[in-house]
């Protein structure tokens, strides 16, 4: 069940030219044109295959320089854990230019002065109905009906940025559109 929905979403990500992510009244757009969605199913049958567990996400590296707008992260963030309050991230030309909220300064400190660390590196969708929000992003990002973005590196999964850092931020029940097709709303996949 997890693998099947993960593959469907991965295919939709691959086919899409644009993604629109909406949460808490904020809207973020990004190009996915010619990028390949990746299914993280947790099923590894071939020698050399790898992943992290628990698994259950479909993800993609958005086109560098394409992210525009704002998004509200209201779950957890790698390096911080469960957020004290929602965190608003502002993007221009593919790069996070501001982080507003009680944990904003901590996030900016984690990213440091390296400009590539602020690259919008990933868009992902959680597909694991057994995963739970714990404050540990490796599980939180897999929770069914969530979405996440990441900042920093994406060169290991189809992107072009090697920043030496990769931090994911989880949204609990956003809306996600792929080329005007609604695929996620109110914590439920629309596939």
Where in the sequence are the language-model features?
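Short polybasic amphipathic segments
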Residues: 18-21, 87-90, 97-99, 173-182
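Active-site bordering "gate/hinge" segments
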Residues: 1-80, 84, 180-186, 191
């Amino acid at each position: 069940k997890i693998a099947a929905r993960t593959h469907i979403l991965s295919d939709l990500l691959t086919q899409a030219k644009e993604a629109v992510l909406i949460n808490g009244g904020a809207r973020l757009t990004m190009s996915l044109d010619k990028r390949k969605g990746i299914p993280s199913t947790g099923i590894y049958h071939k020698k050399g295959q790898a992943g992290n567990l628990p698994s259950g996400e479909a993800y993609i590296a958005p086109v560098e320089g394409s992210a525009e707008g704002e998004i509200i992260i209201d779950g957890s963030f790698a390096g911080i854990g469960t957020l004290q309050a929602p965190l608003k991230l502002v993007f221009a030309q593919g790069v996070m230019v501001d982080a507003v909220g009680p944990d904003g300064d901590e996030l900016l400190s984690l990213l440091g002065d390296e400009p590539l660390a602020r690259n919008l590196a990933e868009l992902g969708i959680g597909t694991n109905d057994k995963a739970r929000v714990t404050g540990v992003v490796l599980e939180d990002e897999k929770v069914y009906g969530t979405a996440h973005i990441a900042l920093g590196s994406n060169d290991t999964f189809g992107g072009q940025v090697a920043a030496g850092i990769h931090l994911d931020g989880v949204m609990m029940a956003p809306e996600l559109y792929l080329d005007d097709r609604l695929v996620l709303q109110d914590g439920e996949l629309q596939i």
